[in-house]
Every structure is written in C-alpha cells, then in structure tokens.
Amino acid sequence: MEGETSWISHCPDYVAPDMVEFDSFSELNDEDNGEASLVPVDLILPDDLLERILAYLPIASIFRAGCVCKRWYEIVKSTRFLWNFSQVLSQKPWYFMFTSSEEPVGYAYDPSLRKWYGVELPCIQTSNWFIASSCGLVCFMDNDSRSELYVCNPITKCYKSLDEPPGLKFSDYSALAISVNKKTCCYSVTIIKSKQVPGNFFQWDLAIHIYDSGKMMWVTPLTEVLTGWRGGDESVICDGVLYFLIYSTGGGGPDNRHGLITYNLSSRSSHGLLIRSFIPVPCSLTCGRLMNLKEKLVMVGGIGKPDRPDIIKGIGIWELNGKEWQEIARMPHKYFQGFGEFDDVFASSGTDDLIYIQSYGAPALLVFDVKQKQWRWSQKCPVTKRFPLQLFTGFCFEPRLEMAP
C-alpha cells in the first residue's frame, strides 16, 4: 500500500542484506581519469567513531544500517552502541495507531521522517487494552480480567510479564500509568481501581496499587471511599507525583463534572483524604487526557459549549503550575473542522515536546509541537475507513533501543 513501510523489513534479524538497497560512498579520483572509485567506510572509520555516528541516525535508519554488512550488524547490536545511543538526545516520540478493534495491528508514525511503519506489538491481544508508556517502555493491561500485565519495548519486542496486582480482581474503572527512572532504568507501574459501593451510587471505593520493578513486588499504600466522585481511566506520573482524573457522580453543576487528584509516590502517605488534593479543571470539559511532557503535567481537553457542556466546541491544552492551570494552546478552528465530525471524546497522548490528537472516527492524526507552537497534520496513514462504525485509537511512545523491561 502506498505510504506504508514494513517495520520488520528494517530489522536485521528478519531480512537478508540483499533486500535493501544503499547508496555507496564515492569520491572523484583525478589519477583515474575522473572515474569514481568506491571508498569502503570500514577502511576509514574505527569502530568507536562509527558507533557514535550511527547512534545519531533515526531508529529506522539504524535498522537499515544493520543490513549493510556483518560489521555494521554487530555494531548496532553491541552493548557499547546501545550506551552511545542512550547518550544521544531522545528521538521524537512516535504514535502507534490501531487499525482494528479486534486485533492489535496498526502503524507507527515517525514525525522526524514523516513515515508510517507497519509494527507488530508483542503481548497485547486487542486494541481496547489499557496502555501507558514512559521512556521507551510501554505497559499493557487487559480490559477483561485486568490481571494480565506486560511491560515491553515495542521497538526491540523485549517484554516482561508482571504479577497480578493485589486487591479487587474486578473493578468498574481502572487507570494505568508507568514511570521509568532514566538513571537506574527501574520503573514503577500504578493502577488506580475504582468500584461502586454496593447499593450506593454516590460512594466509590478507590485503591492505588504500585509495582516497583527493582523490588519486583506490588504494594497498596492507599484505599479510600470517595463520595460524589469516582475514579476513571486517565492517570499519569510526572516527577514522582501520580495524577488522575475523577468524575462527578451527581450533585454538582455542569462545570464541575471533572476534577484532578494528586498523590505523591515518594511519601506514599496513607493518611488524610485524597479529596484534599482536589484541583478543579480549567473549564467545562467533555473529556480530558493527561500526559507527561518533560515532567510537567499537561492536559488536552474537549471544551464544552456553554449551554450544552456535553457538546464539544473546541480543544484546549493546559499545563499545571502548582495548583493553577495555564492554557498553552487552543486548536485552531480549521484543524478542528479538518477532523470532520468530532465526538465529545477523542484520543490524545504525548511526551517530550509533541502532542498527538486523533478522532476515534477517522485515521486523521494531528501533531502539536509545544516548543514551536506549531500545528501540523501527519502524513496520511496507509489505511482507510472500511465501515461507518470502525474506530481508530492509538498511543504515543518514545522509540528507544537501549530500554528493556
């Protein structure tokens, strides 16, 4: 299909070198009557210098480089090369778009090269699983029993299965988050479970479960009953603090349907009410999506109409400073219209300086560069909508080679 590139075709483990074409290095030699003579790179550069050069290539180009020859293949697979790669500035985050509701298949978008790659995700079975990512690792949790948990690197396909979290086996709502410590390469996974108190719609049991990869164990530092609010499926970890959205169960006005709760993962206090950390959302929202941009909490939200708060009229982006929201951007109307019919809920995720926004009803993908304040459509995804009720969703992740669960 036009515009599609198979990610597997770039992986030296799966493809023979003669399947990929490369340009040769050449220079003009006056002594040979102006004819070009090939100059093998192997004779010019020592291993350590070649490793540093290759480490600055985009991810896809690194896999292509591994197909050039045996020497280059061994270099890109070496531990020293992975260390060099880890010292290079992070690659721009990619966006994986699911193209089926039944199977975990789709394409990953590279904003640097503006290309889509066919990527096969390990572990995950359907696109409706819970997904969270941090620093090259992605965490999956099944949506049925919520007992299957995996942490993987979607680029290298390395993965690890986590033990089932403690507490309630079944919950009405769950929120998943992961945070990787770049210095130690250890990670924390949090699951917030929310379940209605039997016979009381206004009261909801809420529990926070934390997995520490260093200790390889779960702890449940907090359980609490919320009145008038319930947990949902939005959470993220920024600079050691767990943020999650809560939703009104009735009694509040139309401007008070969402709220934000914070929980410090370092202190892990089990005392005091969570509701004391309540932070109101900046305006009436149809939905909110939380993300970590350089350890700052950013929320992308659908802005509701004043007279019909459940009807979306636009999309805003806010950053949390202390307990105050600061609007950093609002989607221009031409891009909002460019999605066509836009539902009151939508997919959005981001990291570093990029935010991706996607309508569930179409494969169109909009990218916002926070640093440059620039909106831009992605290259067209190599998939078309086959039937009216077909849904599209996805998630953002950092493409990294050196991270392993």
Which residues does each predicted region cover?
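Short, conserved recognition motifs on repeat-domain binding surfaces
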Residues: 1-405
